[in-house]
Amino acid sequence: MSLVIMARTRLTTGGFAEPVVADTAKSLSKQGHRVILLAWDRTGKNETTTTTEWGTIWRYQEECALNNAALFARKLPGFLSWSTWQILAFQKIEKDIVLHYHDLDTLMGGVFTSKLAELPLIYDCHENYPGLVKGAVSSIVAKLLHKLEAKLLSHCDGIISAGPANYARLDGMLEQGGKAPFAATEEEAFKVMALPQRDFLNTKLTRIGNIKRLDNYPLRRIENKEKNKTFRLLYIGVLERHPSRGILETIMTVSKMKGIQLDIGGFGTLVPTIKKLQEKSKNVNYMGPIHPDNVALKTIESDAVLMALDPSNINNRLSAPNKLFEAMAASVPIITCKELLMGQLVEREEIG
C-alpha cells in the first residue's frame, strides 16, 4: 500500500487536523495506507510531531494570524518549501508515495513537488477558495487566483470535491480553463446532487461527500438524551470577522431573549470581543476551543446548531459546510440563512 503525504495550511484546536481532513486520513488508513499530514501550525506552540489513530502529524511551526491575508501570503512559501523538503526526504526511503494537497493555497507547491519528485498528485478542493477570500483580497486578486487554479488543475492526477456547487465549478474549469465562470449556479449544484454515485467513479474529478462517522453519534445516546432546562443553541468553529458567520449578531439577539443559552466554542480574533459581550449577558457562554473529538457530544447535547454564513460571500452561498452534516448526524436542527444553498436544502428536507 502507499504512503499518502498530505499538506494543509491550518490545524484546529490543540494542533490537530480538522474533522474533514482527519476523516479522509482515517478512511485511507482503514484501507491499509499509511498517512502523514504536513501541516502549518500557525500558533507555533504545538509539538513538532504527533501520532494519531490514522497516522502522524508533522507541524511547520511559524506564527501567522488566520485573518491576516498579507502576512499569510508572505509566509506561505516557507511552508510550501518545508513541505517539499520533507517529501523529498521521505522519497529516499519510500518507493510508493502519493501526494494529497488540501485547497488552493497548497496546490502550487503540490504541482511543483509532484513534477520535481515525479509523484502522483491528488488535489482535495474543500471550497471555492477564490470566492472565499474575495473581500479579504481585491476582486482582481480573486480573479487571478481563479485563473491560477484552472491552470494548475491540468497537472493533477485526481481532484476531489465535497460540495455539489464546487464540483460543478471544477468541472467547468476542466473544460473551459480560466474562462470558466467564477462560481457555479444553484441550478448546477442541484443537478450534481441528483447524479448517481456511479457517475463519480473512475474519473479525474470525483465528489466525496462530507459524511460523518455515525459511530461518533450513537443512536442510543441521541434517543435517550435529557431535555435541557433552557434551549441551547450551539456554534463551534472559527471565530473570525471575514467571512462572517453571524456570531456577533446572534449574541446581540440572544442576549435580549429569555429561555435560551448560546454556547460558543472555537478560536480566532473575535474571542476577546465575545468574552466582553459574555460579561454583559447571562445567557452567552464562551466555552473556549473545543477538541475535535468532543464536537459530536456537544452537538448531541444541544437543541440547535447555528451556521449563519454571510450570503454575500459566493463561497458561503454555495457551500455544504461540515456543521450541516454534524447537525444531521446528531439529529439536531440547524439554524441558517434561507439565501444559502444550504438553507434551501434545510428548508426542503425540513431539518432546521
Model-derived features with residue positions:
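Nucleotide-sugar donor phosphate/pyrophosphate-binding loop at the beta->alpha transition
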Residues: 77-78, 117-122, 129-152, 168-178, ...
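N-terminal subdomain of nucleotide-sugar transferases
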Residues: 1-45, 49, 158, 175, ...
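Glycosyltransferase donor-sugar binding loop
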Residues: 236-240, 261-274, 288
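Conserved donor-binding/catalytic core segment of Leloir-type glycosyltransferases
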Residues: 4, 210-212, 216, 225-255, ...
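Nucleotide-activated donor-binding/catalytic signature segment of Leloir-type glycosyltransferases, i.e.
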Residues: 230, 272-304
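A short, active-site helix/loop in glycosyltransferases that binds the activated sugar's phosphate group
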Residues: 142, 146, 150-204, 344-348
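Nucleotide-sugar-dependent
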Residues: 241-245, 291-298, 305-325, 335-344
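Membrane-proximal helix-turn-helix segments that form the acceptor-binding/catalytic region
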Residues: 23-26, 80, 84-91, 108, ...
